[in-house]
Amino acid sequence: MATINDHYLKLKAGYLFPEIARRVNAFAAAQPDAQIIRLGIGDVTEPLPAACRTAMIKAVEDMGDRSSFRGYGPEQGYEWLRQSIAEHDFQRRGCEIDASEIFVSDGSKCDTGNILDIFGDNNTIAVTDPVYPVYVDTNVMAGHTGAANEQGEYAGLVYLPVTAENGFTASLPEQKVDLIYLCFPNNPTGATASRAHLQQWVDYARANGSIIFFDAAYEAFITDPDLPHSIYEIPGARSCAIEFRSFSKNAGFTGTRCALTVVPKTLTAKAADGSEVEIWKLWNRRQSTKFNGVSYIVQRGAEAVYSPEGQAEVKGLVSFYLENARIIREQLSANGLAVYGGVNAPYVWVKTPSGFSSWEFFDKLLHTCHVVVTPGSGFGAAGEGYFRVSAFNSRANVEMAMQRIREKLAT
C-alpha cells in the first residue's frame, strides 16, 4: 500500500482560518438572518486599481492577436515587470537589488513555504510567537519539527515571544539558529521594526551564518519615513536575507495572485560537503522545475501598479485601509480594550477582556455582535488572550462592526 507523509499528521486539527470558517458557517446556518461582518482573514474588499484593470484588459486583447499572443512565459517573471519592481521598490530606497534577483510568483504565502525546498532538514528554525501560522505549518509538513505540546508549540522550533512588554518585537535568540522568520509590519500584531532593530538581526545573522526570511507583505502601509520598508535598507542584509513581497494588500491582488521573492546573488549557504552554494541558483532551479510562472495578463496588471496612475490609486487604497485601522483602533480603545498596532499596519491587535480566552471572545463577538475576528491563540501560545482585527473591509462594515461592539459589549 502507498504511504503518506506522516509529518502532516502532526499538524493541529485545523488550520486557523478553516476553523474560523467552520464556526462562522455553523452560526450562519443557525442564524440565517444575521448580518455577519468579517474582520478576520485579511482579504481585501476594494476593487482593483483602474490602471491595473486597463492594463489587464489590453493584455487580454494581446492574447487574442497572433502577433502579440504569449504562451509560456519565463518562470522568473517577465523582465519588464522585474525591472519596474527593482527600480520602484528597491533602488529608489537605496537598495542594491537587481531585476535578475527578483522572482515573480503567484503569492508570498506559497513562496514562504516553498523556499524550504532548497534548505536542509537539519537547520534550527526560529519563529516569533505569535506568528503567521504558515511559517510553522510548512516546517511541520517538511519534517523540520517534532510533535506539538498542549500549547501547540512544536518540538524543534525556537519560539521568540513577542509581548506588549517588548513592543511585540522579538529579542535575539540566546542560541544559534539557522533560519529566522521575521515579518514587518507584523502579522498578526501590527508591530513595526526600526532600522536599529533590523540591524541587530542582520548583525546576528551574519555572525552566525543564519538566513533571515523577511516577509514584507505589508510594507506599503508604512507611512512613518523613519521606518524601513525593506530588509535590504539595512547594511549587510544582502548576504543574509531573502525578502518576500506581495501585490495582494496594496493593490488588491488577493484574487488575481501576484507576488515576488528577492534572492540576492551574494547569498550563500553550506552544502553537506562544507562548500558554499549560491541560494539564487537553487531557487532558480526549484522554480524552473516546479513553477510555470504567473500569467502574462496578471503580470501586465502588476506592472501598471508602477505607472503614475497606478501609484496614485494604490496610495488611495492603502490610505483607505489605514483609515479603517484608525477607526478600529480608536473605537476599541474607547470601549476600554487594550489596543496595539493599526499604525503603519492594517492589523489591530487587541487584548481580550479579563476572563476571556481568545476563542471564547471570538465566539462572544460572533454570537453577540455578529462580528468575526481572528483569535490570537491561533497564531501561537503567546497569542492567547488576544484577538486580531483586520482593516480590510468596507468603511460601512467597519463602522457598523464598531457600533455593534460599542453598544453590545460596553466594558
UniProtKB/Swiss-Prot annotation:
Residues at which substrate binds: 15, 42, 109, 132, 187, 292, 388
InterPro entries in the record: Aminotransferase_I/II_large, DapL/ALD1, PyrdxlP-dep_Trfase, PyrdxlP-dep_Trfase_major, PyrdxlP-dep_Trfase_small
Pathway membership, UniProt: Amino-acid biosynthesis; L-lysine biosynthesis via DAP pathway; LL-2,6-diaminopimelate from (S)-tetrahydrodipicolinate (aminotransferase route): step 1/1
Cofactor: pyridoxal 5'-phosphate
Alphabetical keyword list: Aminotransferase, Pyridoxal phosphate, Transferase
EC number: 2.6.1.83
Domain of life: Bacteria
Gene Ontology MF term list: L,L-diaminopimelate aminotransferase activity; pyridoxal phosphate binding
Binding-site residues, pyridoxal 5'-phosphate: 72, 108-109, 132, 187, 218, 246-248, 257, 292
Residues with PTM N6-(pyridoxal phosphate)lysine: 249
Function, in words: Involved in the synthesis of meso-diaminopimelate (m-DAP or DL-DAP), required for both lysine and peptidoglycan biosynthesis. Catalyzes the direct conversion of tetrahydrodipicolinate to LL-diaminopimelate.
Oligomeric form and interacting partners: Homodimer.
Protein name as catalogued: LL-diaminopimelate aminotransferase
